[in-house]
Amino acid sequence: MAIKLLNDNVINKIAAGEVIERPASVVKELLENAIDAASRNIAVKISGAGLDSIEVTDDGEGISMEELPLAFLRHATSKIENEGDLLRIMSMGFRGEALPSIASVSRIDIYSKKEKQEGIHCFIEGGKILDLQYFPGPEGSKIIVSDLFFNTPARKKFLRSPVTEGNNAYELVIKYALARPDIAISFSNEKRQLFRTPGNGSLNDAVIAIFGRDFLEPLIPVKWEGLSLSISGLISPPGVAKMNRKRQLIFVNQRPIRSPLLYRALDEGYRGLLLAREQPLVILQIAVPPDSIDVNVHPQKSEIRFRDEQSIFRSLCGLLRDTLNARDYRLQDNLPQNRSQPFYPAAGRKTAKQKVEEQPVIPFMHNRKADKRVEETGGEPWIPFYPEEQAEGSVSRVYDEFKILGQLWDSYILLEKEQTLNIVDQHAAHERIIYSRLQQFYAASRGEMQMLAFPLLMDLSLRDMELLEKNQEILGELGFDLQQAGPRSIFLRGTPAIIAGQEREVLFEILELLAGGQGINLKNEAIIKMACKKAVKAGTRLDYREMMQIIQELFITDDYKNCPHGRPTIIAWKQADLERMFKR
């Protein structure tokens, strides 16, 4: 086949494949253009997850009648003029690819007006300008993108669900709203505004506008300035963490970025203060000279390279350690030490205490008769889930004789049974036990609710309020009693008994599940969240009786070999396996 020069329409569609992957990509490019136009107010609205329409309105500089046709030509831009400008980029965009790429796969209406000039309207379909005329309007621009991917239907097959695509756009606008707290940025989905930042330059006020005051309250302000580097923002104390990096928002020269280097710095700064897989919450602004970074790495400009990576790494690590060392945050501080909360969820029975004498560190033989010596007390909550008469019959299914050899690294229970060495992950095992019991509870009836003596007042985001309103029934089934207190606040009056002391944290976790549109698995995912939060954590020292209780309950639990997330609870080596390793 002969080599041919592709026409502009095909070239633009190829470029669109790199730049415009999904509706959120369109939102990103239009939002960056609005920021570069020196806008003070930007409104983003989407409909149909962004496939039906995406509208971005700003009060920026606008586009003139003469410039507008150029705006839809590839590599036409007002951001740079020569090669040297690439070394000191401060604008969000600079490639001149966004508008032609968007136009090639959608229908676009543009309304724009520059100061002291007439307003204009332009209609573009599939990359072709079909109408261009003067049109009265306010200064600034309004761009409406409709029928995204109408001429590339195969692209739609690779998109996620409407809920997921809508959330992608929502999360993206959040990043820019926090990167630029000096600009009032709002986001609306299906004509309902989910947030609007005040644009007064205060990061705290922007966080409150987006997430609510309860999100901001535990965060710690940080600030550090060097000769050619400054870092400022908010970080979470070790006791406040998530299981992913979703709320690690990092901006370099006010540009949202992803950086493995900075993620490693966060991991190092929090090393020894978080449990395995936990991630801190951070909102950080890093300012460096524009010629010390390279943003021309990826078409989406989401990755950058630092000229002096070691300096950035050391500075961020040092700031985190100095801030967190101001108080003696130890890992043990973040683990549940209050034994006034049950080790297992108890169903309507008195608290019981098993009298077990102090056990030696060296192996000891399990003796169920000794464990059955019980006395009534009023304070020790580490009780079996089952009532005692039920537990006795169930435990007969457990190993008749085994040795608990001890605890390894305050995280694993070592167990010997029938010439087999078993290593039990205490968190995964306890999580499986609690999950199975909660499933039984919720299968039999509505969740066991504990009414709070003093209702908790929670300040939430508008999106969270919308999610609560739409999911009242399933939250009630889980055991939550909520009452609206204001446009953005609720009274939490009752919660599932199992999450006592962790009400706020668990509700926020469930709100994330609701936002993700888990559908028919939502209830099960919420139960997993509650079990995970309640389960004893890695790094928690257990006494003999507590280890014994986990082992007894684990082996009478269905599917005991894996936790609800699918990770193994127990790993076993037979004596023959060990002898083979030692070449005996």
UniProtKB/Swiss-Prot annotation:
Task: Report keywords, A-Z.
Answer: DNA damage, DNA repair
Q: Span of the secretion signal? A: none
Pfam families, A to Z: DNA_mis_repair, HATPase_c_3, MutL_C
Q: Which domain of life is it from?
A: Bacteria
What is the protein's known function? This protein is involved in the repair of mismatches in DNA. It is required for dam-dependent methyl-directed DNA mismatch repair. May act as a 'molecular matchmaker', a protein that promotes the formation of a stable complex between two or more DNA-binding proteins in an ATP-dependent manner without itself being part of a final effector complex.
Q: Transferase as a keyword? A: no
Listed under GO cellular component are: mismatch repair complex
What biological processes does GO assign it? mismatch repair
InterPro entries to which the protein is assigned, alphabetical:
DNA_mismatch_repair_CS (IPR014762), DNA_mismatch_repair_MutL (IPR020667), DNA_mismatch_S5_2-like (IPR013507), HATPase_C_sf (IPR036890), MutL/Mlh/PMS (IPR002099), MutL/Mlh/Pms-like (IPR038973), MutL_C (IPR014790), MutL_C_dimsub (IPR042120)
A GO MF label = mismatched DNA binding
Protein's UniProt name: DNA mismatch repair protein MutL
- Which family is this protein grouped under? Belongs to the DNA mismatch repair MutL/HexB family.
- Is DNA damage one of the keywords UniProt gives this record? yes
